[in-house]
């Protein structure tokens, strides 16, 4: 943190945003992209790319992708922070229109100048809230308690709060506490003009494959070659034309020249994200899993039963038991588990859902283990080689947080300030 030439100590206004998605076209990232652009043309500097933070994919009331967002805005004075929060953000939120369940929160951090300052100075309750919100079900009261903690913290100040009684508050605060130090990725999202939102997307499939082949492994989940299916475009009525994900922002900009679309986009924005990091998964003993957890459990196959619809239920036991569902959409993952004999030791990661009087773990991946890996309640931290085989579903079955096996490891990845433009120069409506 440094003193500016005018003698003012710089500050950061952190804005957390959630629940601007609606069944008909509303989108939290779209609102955030417009807000980022609006702040830029008013002369405000963003201290980082906008954050796109995916939270617990198992919760029952999520909107598309269960994503919240955050912006870090450099300001010089508290009254300037209030203008950003109350005049720019609040007015834009009202003009954008939504279901009335949207939330945003603006927190001012004193003596903060850049991204690293923010990571160091942000209230600890935000970090803890994120860690819980990405793994498990978080009560609204937990978010309210975090707000009270921020109000009493002399290093920060709550500048604005909208939607404090809605569950979007959990996402808005959790986004501000996201752990993007351990691992992070980027997504370039290209948006559509409003008149096109109800029209089918026309994106040349060959150009998606070309982009994938030219940019891998720095980009990922562009195309499912097993099912001959593009993965970059949503299917509903919303403002997103397509999004490409990767390790570094500069590689994503190539999509603007390579991917061929039959419409003029409105604008684009690059987000820093926790996508494709497996941030949601947490190792647990079977007896400790709860509804809407995202858990990794270890156990022995007790029983395997195909059920109507092409799905398979595996009874997995280690002191206690849990049903593990391998749905038809998991393809070869389901096919392989059918061949495993009773007594096979496996590790399964996925989402815990309540079904009548018991819990079911919806499988995202399967690891076949050596019997020596089993210990009381779980598996050894270091898993032996040999039969240590990991199986995944087709890429089309991956959700936002699932880490594809082709993603390279980046143990030294650091939080660097923006190295490319954050968004397009204009928005064309």
Swiss-Prot record:
Localization: Cytoplasm
GO biological process: tRNA wobble cytosine modification
Gene3D superfamilies (alphabetical): 2.40.50.1010, 3.30.70.2200, 3.90.600.20
Region (Disordered): 403-429
Main location: cytoplasm
Entry GO terms, CC: cytoplasm
Keywords: ATP-binding, Cytoplasm, Ligase, Nucleotide-binding, tRNA processing
Alphabetized InterPro entries for the sequence: TiaS-like_TCKD, TiaS_FLD, tRNA_Ile2__agm2C_synt
GO molecular function annotation: ATP binding; ligase activity, forming carbon-nitrogen bonds
Name of the top EC class for this enzyme: ligase
Pfam families per record: TiaS_FLD, TiaS_TCKD
UniProt EC number: 6.3.4.22
Catalytic reactions on record: cytidine(34) in tRNA(Ile2) + agmatine + ATP + H2O = 2-agmatinylcytidine(34) in tRNA(Ile2) + AMP + 2 phosphate + 2 H(+)
Functional summary from the UniProt entry: ATP-dependent agmatine transferase that catalyzes the formation of 2-agmatinylcytidine (agm2C) at the wobble position (C34) of tRNA(Ile2), converting the codon specificity from AUG to AUA.
HAMAP family hit by this protein: tRNA_Ile2_agm2C_synt
PANTHER family the record matches: DUF1743 DOMAIN-CONTAINING PROTEIN, TRNA(ILE2) 2-AGMATINYLCYTIDINE SYNTHETASE TIAS
Similarity field: Belongs to the TiaS family.
Protein name: tRNA(Ile2) 2-agmatinylcytidine synthetase TiaS
Organism encoding this protein: Hyperthermus butylicus (strain DSM 5456 / JCM 9403 / PLM1-5)
Lineage, uppermost ranks: Archaea, Thermoproteota, Thermoprotei, Desulfurococcales, Pyrodictiaceae
Gene: tiaS
């Amino acid at each position: 943190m440094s003193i500016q030439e005018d003698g003012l100590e710089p500050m950061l206004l952190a804005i957390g945003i959630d629940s601007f998605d609606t069944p008909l076209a509303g989108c939290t990232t779209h609102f955030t992209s417009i807000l980022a652009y609006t702040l830029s043309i008013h002369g405000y500097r963003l201290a980082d790319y906008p954050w796109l933070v995916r939270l617990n994919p198992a919760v029952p009331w999520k909107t598309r992708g269960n994503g919240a967002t955050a912006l870090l805005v450099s300001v010089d004075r508290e009254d300037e922070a209030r203008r950003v929060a109350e005049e720019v953000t609040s007015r834009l939120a009202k003009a954008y229109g939504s279901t009335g369940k949207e939330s945003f929160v603006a927190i001012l951090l004193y003596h903060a100048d850049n991204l690293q300052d923010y990571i160091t100075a942000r209230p600890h309750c935000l970090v803890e809230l994120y860690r819980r919100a990405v793994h498990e079900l978080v009560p609204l009261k937990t978010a309210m308690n975090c707000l009270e903690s921020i109000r009493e913290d002399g290093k920060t100040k709550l500048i604005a709060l909208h939607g404090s009684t809605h569950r979007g508050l959990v996402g808005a605060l959790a986004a501000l506490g996201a752990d993007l130090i351990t691992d992070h990725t980027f997504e370039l999202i290209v948006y559509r003009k409003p008149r096109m939102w109800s029209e089918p997307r026309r994106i040349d499939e060959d150009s998606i494959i070309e982009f994938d082949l030219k940019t891998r492994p720095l980009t990922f989940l562009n195309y499912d070659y097993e099912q001959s299916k593009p993965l970059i475009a949503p299917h509903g009525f919303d403002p997103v034309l397509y999004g490409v994900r990767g390790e570094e922002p500069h590689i994503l900009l190539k999509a603007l020249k390579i991917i061929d679309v039959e419409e003029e986009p409105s604008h684009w924005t690059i987000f820093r994200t926790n996508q494709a990091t497996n941030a949601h998964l947490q190792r647990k003993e079977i007896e400790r899993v709860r509804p809407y957890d995202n858990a990794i459990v270890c156990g022995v196959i007790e029983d395997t039963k195909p059920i109507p619809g092409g799905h398979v239920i595996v009874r997995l036991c280690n002191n206690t038991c849990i049903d593990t569902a391998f749905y038809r959409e998991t393809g070869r993952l389901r096919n392989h588990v059918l061949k495993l004999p009773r007594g096979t030791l496996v590790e399964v990661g996925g989402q815990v859902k309540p079904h009548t009087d018991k819990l079911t773990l919806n499988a995202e991946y399967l690891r076949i283990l050596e019997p020596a890996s089993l210990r009381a309640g779980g598996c050894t931290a270091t898993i032996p080689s040999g039969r240590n085989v990991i199986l995944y579903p087709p890429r089309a079955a991956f959700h936002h947080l699932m880490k594809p096996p082709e993603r390279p490891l980046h143990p030294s990845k650091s939080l660097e300030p923006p190295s490319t433009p954050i968004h397009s120069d204009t928005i064309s409506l």
